Amino acid sequence: DLGDGARRTPNTRATDILLADGLVARPGNAWPSLGFDIGALAARFPGLLPAGFYYKTFMWPGWRWFEPAIRRAAGLGHAAGATTGADPDRYDELSLQVHTLVAGGGVAGLQAAIRAARDGHQVLLMEGQPRLGGWMAAQGDAGRARVAALAHEAKQAGVRVHTGCTVFGLYDHRLAVAVEAVGGGVRERLWKIRAQHTVVACGAFERPMLFPDNDRPGVMLASAVQRYAELYGVACGRRVLLAGACDSAYGVARALQAAGVEVAAIVDHRTEAAAPAPPGVPVHRASAIVAAHGGRAVTGATVIGHDGRTRHEIAADCIAVAGGWTPAVNLYSMAGGRLRWDERASMFVPASALPGISVVGACAGDLEAGEVPADNRPSAAALSALGRRPGKVFVDLQNDVADSDVALAARENYRSVEHLKRYTTLGMATDQGKTSNVNAIVLMGGHTQRTPPQVGTTKFRPPFKPVTINAIAGSRSGERIKPLRRMPGHDWHVARQGLFEEFGSWLRPAAYPRHGESLAQAAQREALQVRRTVGLFEGSPLGKIEVFGPDAADFLDLMYVGTMSTLPVGGARYGILIDENGVVFDDGIVARMAPDRFWVNTTSGGVERVALAFEEWLQCEYVRHRVLVTPVTSAWGNVTVSGPRAWALLEAAGLDAALAPCTMKHMTLREIEHAGTRMRVLRASFNGELGYEINLPAQQTQVLLERLWELGQDLDAVPCGIEALMVMRTEKGYLHVGGDTDGTTLPGDIGMDRGIAKKAANFVGRRSLLRPAALDPQRMQLVGLVPVDRRTKLPVGAHAVAPPGPPGPIEGFVTSSHHSPSLGLPVALAMLQRGRSRVGERITVHHLGTAFAAEVVATPFFDPQGERLHGRA
């Protein structure tokens, strides 16, 4: 883990981190310290922790008992927590279009960039390492001179070069995404690049060798040992033992000798090598390491010939292994490329060209072009001829997956390479199997009598290397990615001591608690007061969409289950929206302002979803309809006045007498002007009381709230929060989409199927409502529940279970539940199989081991005749 506090970054790869003054680093999975790691004791009991042990070892007393310890031991880092505050660093994002993008700055990548630039193309080259050259940069002074010459040539040709910038994904429509470690004022930059042509020149990964105890500290890839020596002047050991199955081991030996590092010997799996041995270095051909010695560091190795007759004990403080090369085909595969197995070279290489994508150099399996020695081709037999020696042979060094785990997966029939990956966690660490995959595929093939192409590879997915969430998010964090919306009357609610909560990305008052009141107590008081006098509620977040055009009425008939084209001007109607599967996804009131203009209300959290659905159908299916859809939620505020004294309050405020209940009917809309402000007043109610929804320009919302509050003091007005509204709508049995519905709810389940058969016009989802499953008489239906004892509140989520109870078939579940202050007893809504035919029946609902007796009742619970919402109470 790197950094402290809010800058802490977990699970970083040490080999990717450049040393710098002030660097803070700590081990990710050593406890209590690296010097004494209790987790290392697990190595003494390998039989207890085989592949998939968590599925079969800890069966008692239960997984939850072991889970915390196992997760802590898994090696995961610790991210910055809530107590450390927000990340203080800045992240940038840049979009760019070029003709040619070259991913990789080795010799092959530089040559490809130069050729493209000389052809007159705009070229961008990105290299993940801090310097260009790849493998060639570590080949002594001559190699660095060649890289410098190519870099100068690229600059002269006009190639734009960025080092420390890794292309980590190729996506559809020629999109490449890269991440750059910037430093200074910007920590990381995300690049989004559209290129007409992309050249993949990512080189190749060196493979480790497989031998017992190959996880000891000091066992390293030979190319890494060479790069440390050549590029940073760091000797990874004073006496280095080289083991290889290809000629690159000999080149590393020469480089180490030139740097003054003693080379103990070269252990070559092969009987012959094209490269000459450095002078004075013993070479053990047709031999293999069968044991690495040492505990906290390597002290030596045991080498045995393939014939079993020769044995050498070699002292060394570093073992450098060169098991051959694996082309870095990740980006090519992400773009849809298929791989083929090159038997001669024992590697997977690109099978064919892709439109707009070229693969060059070692990445294409062309080791000569990639300046990797031509004979670096490991023998598949050498990979699998391990014999059985004491000690674990690790295939994935980061996730501690051994060859015995691969064998176990094969025995337990996890033969698919994807199953092997997930069962053993092979290739699931931060390197995503870049060094381990081919060795594992060869081993699995040996255990299942299959060739590597028959075993296949796992699917390569972005990102190519670990990328921080911060880099992907860029500046889109906090309220920049999810703005917390404040209502136009926010300050008025603050002055009333509103208790704010987030509802569908809006900051809204849940209630207005008085001194010593809980949220529930405040909601009960407010609900009761609204029923007695009058309440003020701001409904500005309510979704508002204007739909207009010559075909607007016909279009809404297609969108809604109900018929909207028959609405008269000034009329309003409740409607539900369903998707192609017939599932209810929103509801609201539609009012007609003119023959070709409609005012559409949706739920507060569903307005974007509804607007997008309207646009999708207009643009993709109903393209001939002359209709415009305009979301106007933020442009209009909403002040809802409801209760027996609602009209008295509006009358005191001087609003038009045409709004009086005796003149303006329920579910009608009037457009008026009051005090110079244009208003759209809708007679509607979500709480069962006489109600007026006053829609007005958002900037005038607080003015109206303050005026009505001032006048309402003589009428015992009360501010009403969301919780009180939920109590009152439950008393009326009104539907709350998303609360009382789920992804299976159809119109018939909530009693909204009346009139469908008579509706002449087609509508979205109609055919789905004719499927056998939709017509099943056993479907769940929305009904009311009351506790038999009339005292116990039924928990939301409690399940109705068929007699004699759990674990019997589930018959339904409670969706809404509140204590009714008006009725003096708890009431609930529930989805229940054949619910409407079971009114009067007693059922039992179960929640967390407790059973509750309930009675199925019809809704509404309160004012069943609807006298109050018509102003007749």
Residue spans for each PLM region:
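Residues forming the flavin
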Residues: 1-484, 635, 849
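A generic local secondary-structure boundary/capping motif
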Residues: 90-92, 112-116, 187-190, 230-232, ...
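Residues forming anionic-ligand binding surfaces in small-molecule and nucleic-acid pockets
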Residues: 126, 204, 414, 524-540, ...
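Short amphipathic beta-strand starts and helix->beta connectors
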Residues: 344, 378-381, 525-532, 577-587, ...
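Conserved, structured C-terminal
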Residues: 486-490, 494-496, 508, 594-596, ...
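Short acidic-hydrophobic surface loop/beta-edge motif
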Residues: 1, 176, 500-501, 575-578, ...
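Well-ordered mid-protein domain cores that form the structural environment of catalytic cofactors
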Residues: 565-596, 601-617
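Acidic, proline/glycine-enriched N-terminal capping motif
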Residues: 439, 446-578, 583
